Swiss-Prot record:
Pfam families (alphabetical): Flg_hook
Gene behind this protein: motD
Organism name: Rhizobium meliloti (Ensifer meliloti)
Lineage: Bacteria, Pseudomonadati, Pseudomonadota, Alphaproteobacteria, Hyphomicrobiales
Region (Disordered) residue spans: 1-175, 195-243, 408-475
Keywords tagged on the record: Chemotaxis, Cytoplasm, Flagellar rotation
One Gene Ontology term from the biological process aspect of the record: archaeal or bacterial-type flagellum-dependent cell motility
Compartments reported by the entry: Cytoplasm
Protein name as it appears in the record: Chemotaxis protein MotD
Length: 475
């Protein structure tokens, strides 16, 4: 901008009157209009602090906003009016705060209008060939994006006005920028909901933090619970399953009752001796027998004798017993302690189950005895799972022996068979008695006949008597 003329720096009253002629008209004094222009130019000069610029006034006017009123013009008296005087009367000479407020109002109106009615907003995307294509998007997403762009442009405009305004009297626009930022923060949940493709929208706190994961719990309460949503558990049943409680007691009622709590996954077990009361849901395990057999250690004398015998093949074959031949592992079991445990359980779905456990070092042998066919089938199907569970506890288990004990059925069947045999024996004895009574007179007659045959005819009668005796069975 060009510096003002020296005559404009002086007051209008002290300046000598200038004669202006327009198209040969006589000279006339400048009126109130000229004095107003001169006063405005002086105020503008004092505000800028005597700044000067070597650039062209037209270029400065375009850089300040492209306002046509900033270009030097000719006044009604034929003289050029300086650009600074024209800028003083232009609307851009308002304070920066007023211009920022105006910009914010314009941005708010732009947000309210949005897209015209009946139009579908489009989003730019790239197809497989890499070319940009326009695809329709959801109205909420398009409106949210338009909101963000409008607010960002408004902030840039306000910041640009603050940066270009170099006057010392310029007012700060921090409040305006804060208002725009608050509007942007308020629009953040809508933007997050629009940009979320599927599933549940991200919480507002995650959007503000710039994180992709769920919002962190504050005060032990997660945002989902605070919003009223029900938290999901890992198993989907609404809660973890309780531990199973077992109560061990002797069959004769003596000794102390031991309670064991085992987690559902079998990873944790707690044994307590003080819990002796029977509670609902507790499975009772009756201990029938618990013994411990101490193995006999082989002394030095026995070892030396055994070594000498084993060195002679003849003695070894002669003294080797049949037990050692059939069970060669029996020699290696010397000196080991054997623990046996026999328990009885009453599961609801299996009936009575008797388990016999034999533990020697880490080797465990399990025998299960059941009384129903359904229990036998279920345990046989779960045999491999039981072996895996015992091996996970550190035991060396080859297999679990399951025995079907139909003792009750066989006993009842044997009793019926013995009763039938007794009844048949009683009937046989009755028939034998009847036969004896009928044969007694015949035997008496046969004896008389034999005696008579012995006296008179000894040739034919003895042969007939022998034939008759050969066909009878005597009890």
């Amino acid at each position: 901008m060009r510096p003002l003329d020296e005559n404009l720096r002086t007051s209008a009253a002290s300046r000598p009157a200038q004669s202006l002629s327009v198209r040969g008209q006589p000279e006339a004094e400048s009126g109130a209009f000229g004095e107003a222009i001169a006063d405005a130019g002086r105020r503008r000069t004092q505000g800028q602090g005597g700044r000067t610029s070597a650039d062209d006034p037209r270029r400065d006017s375009v850089a300040n906003g492209g306002n046509a009123s900033a270009v030097p013009k000719a006044d009604g008296f034929g003289a050029d009016v300086p650009a600074s005087m024209a800028d003083a009367a232009s609307p851009d000479a308002r304070p920066a705060s007023e211009r920022a407020i105006t910009t914010r109002d314009q941005a708010a109106k732009r947000l309210q209008h949005g897209h015209p009615a009946g139009t579908t907003p489009l989003s730019l995307g790239r197809d497989g060939a890499g070319e940009e294509t326009a695809e329709p998007v959801e109205p909420a997403a398009a409106h949210s994006r338009e909101t963000v762009h409008a607010l960002r442009d408004a902030i840039d405009e306000a910041s640009g006005m603050t940066a270009t305004e170099g006057d010392e009297n310029a007012e700060p626009v921090g409040g305006t920028v804060s208002d725009l930022l608050s509007m942007l923060t308020g629009a953040a949940p809508a933007v997050a909901a629009a940009l979320q493709p599927e599933g549940r929208a991200k919480p507002a706190s995650a959007v503000r933090d710039g994180s992709d994961g769920p919002a962190k719990a504050v005060g032990g309460i997660s945002p989902d619970v605070a919003d009223g949503a029900h938290p999901q558990t890992g198993d989907g049943t609404g809660g973890s399953e309780p531990d199973r409680l077992f109560r061990f007691a002797r069959a004769d009622g003596k000794g102390q009752v031991v309670s064991m709590s085992i987690s559902r996954d079998g990873e944790r077990a707690v044994v307590e001796n003080s819990r002796s009361s029977v509670k609902p849901g507790v499975e009772t395990v009756t201990v029938l027998e618990a013994r411990r057999y101490l193995g006999l250690a082989v002394n030095e004398n026995a070892t030396s004798v055994t070594t000498a015998i084993a060195g002679d093949s003849g003695w070894a074959e002669a003294l080797q017993s049949s037990a050692a031949t059939t069970k060669p592992e029996a020699w290696s079991q010397a000196g080991k302690t054997l623990n046996t445990l026999k328990i009885q359980m009453h599961p609801v779905d299996l009936g009575m189950v008797t388990a016999t456990l034999r533990l020697k070092d880490d080797e465990l042998q399990v025998d299960l005895k059941v009384e129903t066919g359904e229990a036998f089938r279920q345990l046989r199907d779960d045999q491999s799972e039981m072996v895996k569970a015992l091996r996970a506890q550190g035991f060396a288990v080859d297999q679990v022996n399951i025995v079907f004990n139909g003792g009750g059925d066989s006993a009842s069947g044997g009793g019926g068979q013995s009763q039938a045999q007794a009844q048949l024996g009683y009937e046989g004895r009755e028939r034998a008695g009847d036969d004896g009574q009928g044969r007694q007179p015949r035997d008496g007659g046969r004896a008389a006949t034999e005696r008579w045959a012995g006296n008179d005819a000894t040739d034919d009668v003895p042969d007939g008597a022998e034939r008759s005796r050969a066909g009878h069975v005597y009890m």
